């Protein structure tokens, strides 16, 4: 059984679980929330997400082109979306998007289970760099997602 690392981060969003789920089930929205260091060049997918459905991404991370083929492993409307990778820069990748209805909106939790290739070098990078990379990426993604769902009330509404 492969060993993997886990990264997890949550954010409170001013939206219903149905709204947040609908946004995340469309992989084309990744370009709306990706940090500048991750440029989305191409997205091929079918919407809505269904278990077993595939999507393909071409991204550029720090100037390096990366091809990604993902598959929706689970698609539970308004509850969770789980994607795995058939082709990616990772040896193992499983990303769960969990949506919980809470006072004030939706608590969305991103949980990433991953392992890097390159043997000992990959394990060293994981211990020294990956937490920083994931933290920076998900801070940026969650900030952009909060801004996307921010609902400012006008006077008199």
Question: What are these model-predicted stretches?
Answer:
Residues 1-51:
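Hydrophobic ligand-binding cavity/cleft-lining segments
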Residues 136-144:
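A non-catalytic, amphipathic alpha-helix used as a structural packing/dimerization or gating element
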């Amino acid at each position: 059984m492969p060993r993997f690392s886990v990264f997890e981060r949550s954010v409170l969003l001013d939206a219903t679980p149905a709204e947040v789920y609908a946004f995340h089930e469309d992989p084309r929205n990744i370009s709306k929330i990706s940090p500048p260091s991750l440029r989305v060049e191409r997205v091929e997918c079918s919407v809505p997400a269904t278990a077993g459905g595939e999507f393909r991404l071409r991204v550029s991370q720090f100037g390096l082109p990366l091809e990604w083929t993902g598959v929706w492993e689970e698609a539970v409307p308004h509850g969770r979306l789980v994607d795995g990778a058939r082709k990616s820069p990772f040896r193992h990748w499983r990303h769960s998007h969990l949506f919980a209805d809470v006072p004030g909106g939706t608590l969305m939790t991103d949980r990433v289970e991953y392992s890097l290739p390159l043997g000992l070098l990959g394990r060293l990078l994981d211990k020294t760099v990956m937490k920083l990379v994931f933290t920076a990426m998900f801070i940026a993604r969650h900030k952009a997602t909060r801004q996307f769902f921010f609902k400012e009330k006008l006077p008199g509404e």
